[in-house]
Structure formats: C-alpha cells, structure tokens
Amino acid sequence: MPEFELPYRLIALDLDGTLLTPQKELTEGNRRALLAAAGRGAHIVPTTGRFFEGMPEAVRSLPCIRYAITINGAQVQDRQTGEVLYRAEIPNRRAIEVMEQLDTLPVIYDCYMDNWGYMTETLYAQGPAYIQDPHVLKMLLELRKPVPELKAFLRETGRDVQKIQFFFPTVEERIRRLPQMQALFPDLNVCSALGNNVEINAPAANKGDALKALCRHLGLPVSQSLAFGDGLNDLSMIQAAGLGVAMENGDPAVKAAAGAIAPSCGEDGVGRFMETLLEQGLL
C-alpha cells in the first residue's frame, strides 16, 4: 500500500461491488471497520446508485450513518434532520423524451422518482429475461412499483426524475452500446454501474459533485475524503476524493484513476484497507 499523509474525516462508500459482497451482504469484517472509523470521528457515507430505502437494512441501520449520497449523486441527505443538502434531477419532459428513444431499443427501463422506483408493467414482467444475476433481479422486483405505462405516469404526475435505468440483454451488448448511448444523450450523465445496465442522471447528478457538496456542508476540505468504488458511476468520486480507492474487481478505468487498489468486494476489501489506515492513524 502507498504511503499516505492526510487523516481522512469522511469515507464515501459505493455499495454494490464495493462495500457489499456479490451476494449483496455486509460482512462482519466490513461492519467492524466502519464502526471503528466512525468511533474515531470519521463520517461514514453510503454513496450509491440506489435510493436510501433500497439499501440493505444492514447498512441503513448502522448507527454511524447520518449522511447519504444516493441515486448516483442526484440527492444528498441528512438522515437525522431529513434535510436535502443537494439535489439534481432530470426535468419531467426530458425524461419522457429519453424514454421515447429507449422504446426503440432492445432494453427494459425504469426510473427513480421521489426516492422510489417505477416501471411499465410489461417491462417489469420481462425482468427475468434481461437480468441473470438473481440478487440484482430480486432488487429490481422488490424496489419497483409497476405502473400501466411509465411515460403516461410521468405526464400525469408532472414530477422530475432522479434517474433512468435500463438493461440490455447482455453485458457484451451494453459494452458495445454504451458509447452510442452517451452520444444519444449528450446533455445527460450516462454511465454503467454493473453488468448489463446503463444509468442516466442529470449532468450535476454524479458522485463526485455530490461528495464535494457534502464536504462543503461539513466544512471539510475534499482532500480529507476517502472514496471506495468499482463501477464507472464511481469514477467521478474516485477522482474527486483526497484518496480514491478502487476495488480489485473494479472496472479497468476506475482502477486506472484510483490512488490505491483494495482487495475485491468478496474478500472484505473495504474493511481490510480501512484496517491498515486505522493502524497507521490515518482514520
């Protein structure tokens, strides 16, 4: 591990592929490391593409969780007061336009609005055909409310959208199509978090900008933040943090941008890396 000089007062943690195991579980080793760092005064901040209620109970119930960066940075919230510290959403009309274009592609899609997921009923029923990972499929089915037709639902509610997510049939198709998707929606933040999914957010909804906003709120220099991630939606915070740490199982672009590499998410990678920092007095 490289030598580091700064004490880290805020730890931003991606969940899927980073803090959680491939089975979407929080290990006891990772839990102990988080509580130990919190005991020394560090802010422990889940930083995820999920909305808060979509996080595993084992994470949500940690006594050290006050702040959360959710939906890829579309929202930063003080969970103690309920105050939303940062918000960046896709305007209602633009979200509908995006979905009209997605209707021409071989994908299923959904959206997050007001901290919950919504999906057209017929697309919801196709989930098992597009999502082979049983843990991801379970998350999709449990955290989406089927509606007769999503675009009509958005027109009716008039609400802005926190995130649009869609799935290609295969990972290979997603890799091939991602540059095309980024060119198709140049005014939006288009990235991939896992497997065969693509996620679309407002331009200001990214984990890096959200991390900076939270640091400003807390009066901390961003140089005193530590960020762990694995996916392309983590790249902005890996680059923004005082120290960005990529998981061994991470995307090559994320690993190339990181200041250090932690063991994989299936090997208590976050906890093991944090234990070293704790031993060095850097947390």
Predicted feature descriptions by range:
Residues 61-64, 71-72, 80, 184-186, ...:
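Short, structured coil segments at secondary-structure junctions
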Residues 28-133:
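Active-site phosphate-binding/coordination module
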Residues 2-10, 26-27, 183, 198-283:
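Mg2+-dependent phosphoryl-transfer enzymes with acidic/Ser/Thr/Gly-rich catalytic loops
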Residues 101, 105-107, 112-228:
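Conserved acidic, metal-coordinating active-site core of Asp-based
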Residues 7-22, 98:
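Asp-based phosphoryl-transfer active-site loop
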Residues 1-13, 32, 39:
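Non-catalytic pre-domain segments flanking phosphatase-related domains
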Residues 24-40, 87-94, 146-151, 202-216, ...:
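Short, acidic loop-to-helix structural element flanking the phosphoryl-transfer center
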